[in-house]
């Protein structure tokens, strides 16, 4: 009987498979072996696409005469730095006594690509090939993955999408970077007084640059509008409460052009005149005209996917997206959490049925022990599969990031940043087994001289899930409001239960005692700059930038890049100095070079800056992976796009106009 060969993506994962198999494994050079099985590993990518000069030496020199470069058949080669390990893996794949190959690379598009390239380059034939697809690296999950492994051919569509993604990035990168560099490097070099300038272009990278530059320009062009709100102090049961004027239908200022959004005067003198009118004799006390009492519930948020985790870590801890991904990968490899590169924020039905194991394990984690025990004692995990936190239709490759309830031997060795990330994953997970938080809210409207003032009050009646979610550092508010929203929202004063009872006793028609009348100056605020976390979310939700409803519906679920690549793209843009990332605040801004590159692309291949195009390409890859369109159909469109756009750039002669654009942009970067 032949042996089984297990091939993982990296050595640490291979060791976990070897442990789970419980064979008497002997360490060899680049693999482990027992009488029954062999376990080996890649070290990330072992094979890559060949540079153009491998096809023909004429392509080594950049020239407009040799583009567009679109090979009929793509060439691949082993990466020099990992040739030894490739030789070992290739030899094992082709060993006569190896009968079955278990592909154990990461369960996703990129993991599939890593293995398929190795198999292609090694020329593997005549073997049974199985795909192990797992969501965590616990022993049970590894054994389940092996037991339920499907034939590798079931993942051929995913493999096609992986190959296409690489070809797309390769063709756009080589052709567009060469075309734009050859056409526009001179004006860039000349303007910046540098020795060389390469215009780096990428399907996703250039689109992200466009989003950041466009946001920066919105901020520059924003004209602030000052306004003056009118505030009234009212005494209620010994408390000084602030009420705010609003131009309701009864007001003489209703829909007046002098008013900004119903609650502020555009001119200070108008605000002063209004206050004088209210203070004129005979004075009036405010009379209660409206009291509304209601309960408001706040449900636990959905579970973390990678983008949401990166966003929260950026806001809470000022950790960059690539660092968050590194930590999430570390937690996964230490068996503490499930697979990190996921877009889903829900669980699968199958996982939901076994979720008590995850919760039970968390009784060994001091931060969560009390909550885990409470959930198990109350049985609140039962029926979770009937809630919004479980939805098989919203899962493509993997469910949300959750704790496994295992791996606690590694907890003490975690870096403090990793420990914090683990804690918020645990808290988010346990939150979904608690009820909604309940607020008692009262809004009061009073009238004085026919003008209305309102105020709102609330008390937390039942903390529900908040007692789990908002402890420790996680108490910081993770929702972001613009400054304008903060200024304009009707203020709801947090109050205690006894004062809420006093408020509840108030009745319509009752007189209250007026205190000071004052004006408060405010101003409209420009859009916020992206931070590293909000940028990741914007990339994930590219559809929000699309006004056409039909097109937005078509690309729903497709963002810019993937959960596995977004952080790396941001990192690259910072590395090549197109973007600047403030490490302390995580705020992202363009550099002068980045804005100049934006101008070059805008004048030559503008669609590359458009989230609609980038998201539609990503949607196409998803359709290939699901078998809805063929690899050939996708490739025809890709070839046509690259050919047309490259040839168009070759015919352009707009370099002189760029200097004016460069000069205009540079004024915003002078120190």
Name the predicted role of every residue range:
Residues 2-5, 93, 153, 219-221, ...:
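Basic, low-complexity terminal or inter-domain segments flanking catalytic cores
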Residues 106, 312, 316-323:
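A conserved hydrophobic secondary-structure block that centers on an alpha-helix together
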Residues 191-200, 211-267, 316, 340:
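C-terminal helical "lid" subdomain and adjoining coupling/linker elements of P-loop NTPases
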Residues 1-178, 265, 384, 526:
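Intrinsically disordered, low-complexity regulatory segments
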Residues 255-302, 310:
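Metal- or metallocofactor-binding catalytic centers and their adjacent structured scaffolds
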């Amino acid at each position: 009987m032949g042996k089984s060969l297990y091939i993982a993506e990296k050595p640490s994962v291979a060791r976990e498979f070897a442990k789970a198999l419980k064979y008497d494994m002997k360490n060899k050079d680049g693999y482990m072996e027992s009488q029954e099985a062999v376990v080996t590993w890649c070290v990330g990518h072992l094979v890559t696409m060949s540079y153009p000069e491998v096809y023909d030496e004429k392509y080594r020199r950049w020239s407009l005469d040799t583009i567009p470069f679109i090979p009929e058949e793509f060439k691949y080669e082993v990466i020099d730095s990992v040739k030894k390990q490739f030789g070992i893996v290739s030899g094992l794949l082709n060993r006569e006594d190896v009968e079955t190959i278990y592909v154990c690379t990461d369960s996703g598009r990129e993991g599939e690509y890593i293995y398929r390239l190795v198999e292609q380059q090694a020329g593997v034939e005549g073997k049974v090939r199985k795909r192990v697809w797992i969501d965590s690296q616990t022993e049970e999950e590894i054994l389940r993955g092996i037991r339920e492994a499907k034939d590798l051919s079931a993942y051929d569509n995913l493999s096609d999408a992986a190959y296409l993604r690489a070809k797309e990035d390769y063709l756009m990168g080589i052709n567009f970077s060469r075309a734009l560099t050859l056409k526009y490097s001179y004006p860039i070099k000349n303007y910046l007084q540098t020795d060389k300038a390469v215009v780096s272009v990428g399907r996703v990278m250039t689109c992200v640059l466009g989003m950041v530059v466009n946001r920066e320009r919105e901020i520059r062009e924003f004209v602030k509008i000052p306004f003056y709100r009118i505030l009234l102090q009212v005494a209620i049961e010994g408390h000084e409460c602030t009420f705010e004027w609003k131009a309701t239908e009864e007001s003489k200022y209703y829909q007046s052009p002098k008013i900004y959004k119903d609650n502020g005067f555009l001119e200070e003198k108008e605000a002063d005149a209004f206050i004088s009118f209210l203070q004129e004799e005979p004075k009036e006390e405010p009379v209660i005209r409206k009291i509304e009492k209601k309960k408001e519930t706040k449900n636990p948020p959905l579970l973390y996917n990678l983008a949401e985790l990166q966003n929260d870590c950026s806001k809470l801890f000022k950790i960059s997206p690539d660092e968050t991904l590194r930590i999430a990968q570390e937690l996964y490899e230490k068996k503490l959490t499930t697979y990190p590169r996921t877009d889903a924020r829900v669980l699968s039905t199958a996982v939901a049925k076994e979720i008590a194991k995850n919760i039970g394990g968390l009784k060994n984690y001091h931060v969560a022990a009390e909550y885990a025990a409470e959930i198990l004692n109350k049985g609140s995990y039962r029926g979770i599969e009937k809630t919004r936190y479980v939805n098989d239709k919203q899962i493509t490759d993997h469910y949300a990031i959750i704790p496994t309830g295992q791996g606690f031997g590694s907890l003490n060795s975690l870096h403090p940043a990793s420990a914090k990330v683990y804690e918020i994953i645990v808290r988010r997970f346990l939150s979904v087994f608690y009820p909604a938080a309940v607020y008692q809210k009262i809004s009061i409207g009073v009238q004085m001289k026919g003008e209305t003032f309102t105020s709102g009050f609330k008390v937390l009646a039942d903390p529900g899930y908040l007692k789990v979610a908002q402890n420790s550092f996680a108490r910081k508010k993770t929702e972001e409001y613009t400054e304008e929203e903060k200024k304009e929202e009707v203020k709801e004063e947090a109050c205690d239960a006894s004062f809420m009872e006093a408020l509840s006793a108030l009745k319509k028609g009752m007189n209250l005692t007026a205190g000071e009348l004052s004006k408060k100056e405010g101003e409209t605020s420009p859009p916020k700059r992206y931070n590293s976390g909000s940028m990741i979310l914007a990339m994930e939700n590219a559809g929000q930038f699309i006004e056409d409803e039909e097109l937005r519906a078509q690309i729903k679920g497709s963002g810019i890049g993937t959960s596995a690549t977004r952080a790396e793209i941001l990192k690259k843009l910072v590395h090549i100095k197109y973007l600047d990332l403030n490490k302390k605040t995580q705020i992202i801004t363009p550099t002068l070079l980045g804005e100049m590159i934006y101008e070059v692309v805008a004048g030559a291949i503008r669609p590359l800056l458009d989230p609609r195009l980038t998201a539609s390409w990503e949607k196409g890859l998803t359709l290939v992976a699901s078998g809805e369109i063929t690899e050939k159909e996708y490739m025809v469109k890709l070839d046509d796009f690259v050919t047309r756009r490259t040839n168009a750039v070759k015919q352009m002669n707009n370099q002189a106009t760029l200097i004016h654009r460069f000069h205009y942009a540079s004024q915003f970067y002078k120190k």
